[in-house]
Amino acid sequence: MLEVEAPLEIVQESSRKLLGLTNLSEITKPLIEAEKPNLNSLCLLNHKEILSHIIPGSPGSLNFKKVETLNFQMVKEFPLLSEYPLLKQKDIGIDTAGVLLKQLMVNKSSCYRDGISTISVPAHMPMHPMVNPSKGSSGLLITKLTLLLPPMFRQGILLLKKLSLLGFRLVRFCLKAIMLKAQEGLLLIVDQVHVLNHVDPIIVH
C-alpha cells in the first residue's frame, strides 16, 4: 500500500473535530490564560489562605486575631499603592530649592513686596542703663573687707593669747606664718583693685 501524506490543514481540521473545537484560538486560549494570571482573581484570594502560605506552621495553629489585624492592614494599604505611581516615589531628594523658596514666600510677614527676606526683630528691646562695673565691684570689695577684718582681728588676738602660753619660739613662728599669709592676701586684693579701677599699684611694706 502507498502511504499518502495528508496536507497539514486537513490534519489540523481533523484534530479540531476530534477535540470538539472549531477555532485555533480556542486551543491557545487556555495556554495564554495559564501563563498570564488574572490580577482580580489574586486580589479575591482569601487572606487566610495567603497567610497560611506565608506564616510557617499549620493553618489550625494560627491566631485568628492576628489574621484579622493583618487583613485590615492589607485592605488599608493595598489601594494606596495603586494610586501613587513609582515615578513620584523616585523623585525624593532631587532638588528642594523650589520647595524652600515656596516655604519662604509663604511667610509674608518677614518678606517685603520685592521678595527680600528679613529677620523679624522685636520692636521694643529692653534697654538697661549703662552701669560702670568697676565702681560697683570695688565698692562691694570694700564693704566685704570692712565686714571681714574685725572678726579676723578678734580671732588673731585669741590665737596669740593661746600661743603665748606655749612658748616664745612657737609664738614667733606662728606670727611669722600669719604675717606672710596676710601679706599674700593683701597683694591679691591690691591686684584685683588695680584691675578694676586702673590705679597705680599700692606698695605694701
Swiss-Prot record:
Q: Name one GO cellular component term.
A: virion component
Q: Which InterPro entries match?
A: Corona_nucI, N2-like_embe-CoV
Any matching Pfam family: Corona_I
Localization per record:
Virion
Using the record, list the residue span of the signal peptide; answer none if the entry has no such feature: none
Which keywords, in A-to-Z order, does the entry hold? Virion
The further comment given in this record reads: The gene encoding this protein is included within the N gene (alternative ORF).
The similarity annotation says: Belongs to the coronavirus I protein family.
Q: What is the role of the protein in this entry?
A: Structural protein that is not essential for the viral replication either in tissue culture or in its natural host.
Q: What is this protein called?
A: Protein I
What's the source species for this entry?
Human coronavirus HKU1 (isolate N1)
Provide the taxonomic classification: Viruses, Riboviria, Orthornavirae, Pisuviricota, Pisoniviricetes
Which gene produces this protein?
Answer: N
